[in-house]
Swiss-Prot record:
Protein name (Swiss-Prot/TrEMBL): Allantoinase
One cellular component term from this protein's GO annotations in UniProt: cytoplasm
Residues noted as binding Zn(2+) 1 in the record, renumbered to the chain: H59, H61, K146, D315
Top-level taxon of the source organism: Bacteria
Pathway listed: Nitrogen metabolism; (S)-allantoin degradation; allantoate from (S)-allantoin: step 1/1
One Gene Ontology biological process: allantoin catabolic process
Length: 453
């Protein structure tokens, strides 16, 4: 048999092992895995390279429409492809209007036409003003619903995202449970974080350490405990976003051991940056929950290797440079990290700390695909989409601003020596990024709808 593509001689990350083996692709799908697979129209030699499932980034902010000057589909998805991401799950906020009903999600689909370099699934918003319209987003095909119990949104803009109070969360989660949906939550205690932040500003405490102190670990842990209890009472599956502390992870682990249907994610910046580095880098490393100290980071690595964190995500949330001006307490909180999830974590987790390749594949791709029901994504296996990434191990480079594909070429990782490189990204059998040739095909990404897979 002749295939469209055969990838030869790479060390392939399979679900429970990694070995040198060939992959055959036909019609955008993985057709076979093995040796002596036959002929193909195209052959790629992956000798000396790691062949990983394309990353499924379950937490990405693309601010189009309405705030395309923050980040747009064209720049954001090119950066994703360059970083080895083949599928993103897009958050319902930062764009205007927020994605909270049928009309607003259709605006997203229209805005993205002809611009997606990678595939994308959508989350709907659970906000204070759309409890009677959640079903519209479920019917369209979102793969989950995001909400905040921390303060969010610009109160001066009517159609911006809004946080929910406990009553709104409980009622919304009840409705989502009936739809067999997942609720995703940003967990920080809104009132305590807000008051601690205002107190620090009044007293002139505006350093990175002051910012971290204004969002202490207990504010994350308390919020996680609360939403775990309320989601359980409401009968809804829960996913806790961007956990930053081992104590927060422990709450999820305890609930899981008690039988609750709950998963969680974290981000590379909580594993590779600490508060002292945050102080040096400045506002580009500001996010919430914040980047904490080295002892906290050590605990996060332990939780990751213990299997208590389900997936790693970028939480890519950029903004124009002027919004990062001023002191750390004033600046916008959000990190541009889309392009450097895979290479940074391969270097730090696999090369420096000995993580197994199958575990890396699960954290970067498989688990997120399973959590959000992306049936054709996340695995190198026959029948799955041929979404693949070539990683060159032990290949150091220093990240420069001009390497970035973002609308604004800034990142807290600029200047960092990264010990691995993404050399090729393949989406449904086509090379969409190549380290030598850039982006060789026009954007071919598609939206993935829950009910149409």
């Amino acid at each position: 048999m002749s295939f469209d593509l055969i990838i030869k001689n790479g060390t392939v990350i399979l679900e429970n092992e990694a070995r040198v083996i060939d992959i055959a692709v036909q019609g955008g799908k993985i057709a076979a895995i093995g040796e002596n697979l036959g002929e193909a129209k195209n052959v790629l030699d992956a000798t000396g390279l790691i062949v990983s499932p394309g990353m499924v980034d379950a937490h990405t902010h693309i601010s189009e429409p309405g705030r395309t000057h923050w980040e747009g589909y064209e720049t954001g998805t090119r950066a994703a492809a360059k970083g080895g991401i083949t599928t993103m799950i897009e958050m319902p906020l930062n764009q205007l209007p927020a994605t909270v009903d049928r009309e607003t999600i259709e605006l997203k689909f229209d805005a993205a036409k002809g611009k997606l370099t990678i595939d994308a699934a959508q989350l709907g918003g659970l906000v204070s003003y759309n409890l009677d319209r959640l079903h519209e987003l479920d019917e369209v095909g979102v793969v989950g619903f995001k909400c905040f119990v921390a303060t969010c949104g610009d109160r001066g803009i009517d159609n911006d995202f809004r946080d929910v109070n406990d009553w709104q969360f409980y009622k919304g989660a009840q409705k989502l449970g009936e739809m067999d949906q997942t609720v995703l939550v940003h967990c920080e205690n809104a009132l305590i974080c807000d008051e601690l932040g205002e107190e620090a500003k009044r007293e002139g405490r505006v350093t990175a350490h002051d910012y971290v102190a204004s969002r202490p670990v207990f504010t994350e842990v308390e919020a996680i405990r609360r939403v775990l209890y309320l989601a359980k009472a409401a009968g809804c599956r829960l996913h806790v976003c961007h956990i930053s502390s081992p104590e927060g992870v422990e709450e999820v682990t305890r609930a899981r051991q008690e039988g609750q249907d709950v998963t969680c994610e974290s981000c590379p910046h909580y594993f590779v940056l600490d508060t002292d580095q945050f102080e040096e880098i400045g506002t580009l490393a500001k996010c919430s929950p914040p980047i904490r100290d080295q002892e906290n980071q050590k605990g996060m690595w332990e939780k990751l290797f213990n299997g208590e964190i389900d997936c790693l995500v970028s939480d890519h949330s950029p903004c124009p440079p002027e919004m990062k001006a001023g002191n750390i307490m004033q600046a916008w909180g959000g990190i541009a990290g889309l392009q450097n999830c895979m290479d940074v974590m391969f270097d730090e987790a696999v090369q420096k700390r000995g993580m197994s390749l199958p575990m890396f594949g699960k954290l970067m791709a498989t688990n997120a695909a399973d959590i959000f029901g992306l049936k054709h994504k996340g695995r190198i296996a026959p029948g799955k989409d041929a979404d693949l990434v070539f990683i060159q191990p032990d290949s150091s480079y220093v990240l420069k601003n001009e390497d970035l594909e973002y609308r604004h070429k800034v990142s807290p990782y600029v200047g960092r020596t990264i010990g691995a490189r993404i050399t090729k990204t393949i989406l449904r059998g086509d090379v969409i990024y190549d380290i030598e040739h850039g982006f060789p095909v026009p954007p071919k990404g598609q939206f993935i709808l829950k009910h149409q897979q």
